[in-house]
Regions:
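Conserved N-terminal glycine-rich FAD pyrophosphate-binding loop of Rossmann-like flavoproteins
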Residues: 33-53
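C-terminal helical "tail/cap" subdomain of flavin- and related membrane-associated enzymes
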Residues: 311-402
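N-terminal Rossmann-fold NAD(P) dinucleotide-binding loop
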Residues: 12-13
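Conserved mid-domain beta->alpha element of the FAD-binding
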Residues: 16, 264-351
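Conserved N-terminal helical subregion
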Residues: 1, 50, 54-166, 174-184, ...
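Conserved FAD-binding catalytic core of PHBH/FMO-like flavoproteins
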Residues: 124-127, 137, 141-152, 156-264, ...
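Glycine-rich FAD pyrophosphate-binding loop
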Residues: 20-40
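Beta1/beta-strand and adjacent pyrophosphate-binding region of the FAD-binding site
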Residues: 1-9
């Protein structure tokens, strides 16, 4: 079986390596000339770590920058509502782990580590799908005219998926109330006093602060979708944050405000493709289901897609020559196994964001929670912890039951 995978993000790269290690001939193409992209998802929940195990890609090499997240903190009007340490499930459980995505991809696809059956082409953009006389997808045509024949084409080319559009597969989008501005503090900034993920809710807006796997402090700021990007100076952004940050974080922001970089806007898109496959074509990751940034589900769901697809396709190939009908049945099983979990987690993400939006737009509720924070902190933390279980562990096994 010849497989062409378009898109060398976590889903495409992981699937390519897993299939090639097992003896499948795989060609992986990526439009970008390199794998280093800013502000990419790096938080691996237990669900994503499980997927890496299933793919045979665990543990992440020690040479890749990584660290266990310290915990989760939510502050309202400058007062800590709750703080919950990782791992949420208690000592000995898997914590949320931050992994540098560019470094991990570089390690995964390094020439010296690459499986013999894997061919990687960076800086080569896909331009169209090829079809045989029966209308079945039979390969990919690149922008330079190169044709890559395949028994199976896998689209892992992101939320704006060219392959999804070329296959005329509609994306059913869900309204989403935010876009996100991402900032990074330069390397000269001090270490944060708290090594967890902090969410700030107040009259200035909804923001988050954390230290990345590579040790750089990052800041996310939510804005309405379609709204103009605010033209604030670094000092003005810092002042807005300080106005609703707890004392320790406010002090850090004031001391390190000069190190804040310019924002990069991330337009949030959430949706489900009407179907994830056609004869000879499979869509995975954001190409099939762009996710909200809430609780870092994009990378985790993409890896779970790759894990289940790898298991299903390798089981099929191990039984001998694969017919077109058998392959299509396998593609249908992959979608049937993965779609319910993705749809449910998108709904859970929306609920999580709705709670934050409620606080954002109800000043009286923020003031009430801030005033009674010492009294309600433990109960709020327990409730929040319970709400996270499915977002952390997923809801479906990583097999098709075949």
């Amino acid at each position: 079986m010849r497989v062409v995978i378009v898109g060398a993000g976590p889903c495409g790269a992981a699937l390519a390596v897993a299939l090639a290690r097992a003896g499948t001939a795989v060609t992986l193409v990526e439009a970008a000339p390199g794998l280093g992209r800013s502000f990419r998802g790096e938080a691996l929940m237990p669900s994503g770590l499980e997927a890496l195990e299933r793919l045979g890609l665990a543990p992440v090499p020690e040479t890749v920058p990584q660290r266990a997240l310290g915990g989760w903190r939510v502050a309202v009007e400058g007062h800590d509502l709750f703080q919950v340490p990782e791992p949420l499930e208690g000592p000995g459980a898997q914590p949320c782990t931050l992994v540098s995505q560019p470094a991990w991809l570089e390690s995964l696809l390094a020439v010296t580590q690459r499986p013999a059956r894997l061919s990687v082409h960076l800086g080569m953009a896909a331009a169209d799908l090829q079809h045989n006389a029966e209308g079945r997808v039979s390969g990919v045509q690149l922008a330079d005219g190169t044709q890559l024949p395949a028994d199976l084409v896998v689209g892992c080319d992101g939320r704006g998926s060219l392959l999804r559009r070329k296959a005329d597969i509609a994306l059913s989008e869900t309204a989403h109330p935010i876009d996100v501005l991402w900032f990074r503090f330069d390397a000269a900034a001090e270490a944060l006093p708290d090594q967890g993920f902090t969410t700030l809710v107040g009259p200035q807006g909804l923001a988050s602060v954390f230290t990345s796997a590579e040790g750089r402090v990052q800041l996310g700021w939510a804005i309405p979708p379609g709204a103009p990007t605010p033209r604030h100076t670094a000092r003005e952004w810092i002042d807005r944050l300080v106005a609703q940050a707890p004392q320790d974080l406010a002090g850090w922001l004031q001391r390190n405000g000069a190190h804040l970089g310019e924002p990069v806007r991330f337009s949030v898109q959430v949706g489900l493709a009407e179907r994830w496959w056609q004869p000879g074509l499979l869509l995975l990751g954001d190409a099939a289901h762009p996710m909200s940034p809430v609780r870092a589900q994009g990378i985790n769901m993409a890896l779970r897609d790759a894990a289940l697809a790898s298991c299903t396709l390798l089981e099929l190939a191990s039984a001998g020559p694969v017919s077109a009908a058998q392959l299509d049945q396998a593609l249908a099983r992959i979608e049937a196994a993965r779609r319910p979990e993705v749809a449910l987690l998108q709904a859970l993400q929306a609920e999580e964001l709705e709670r934050a939006e409620l606080l954002q737009h109800k000043p009286w509720l923020r003031r009430l929670l801030a005033g009674f924070a010492p009294l309600v902190s433990k109960a709020a933390g327990r409730y929040w912890r319970l709400q996270q279980r499915r977002l952390r562990h997923g809801t479906a096994p990583l097999d098709t039951g075949q």
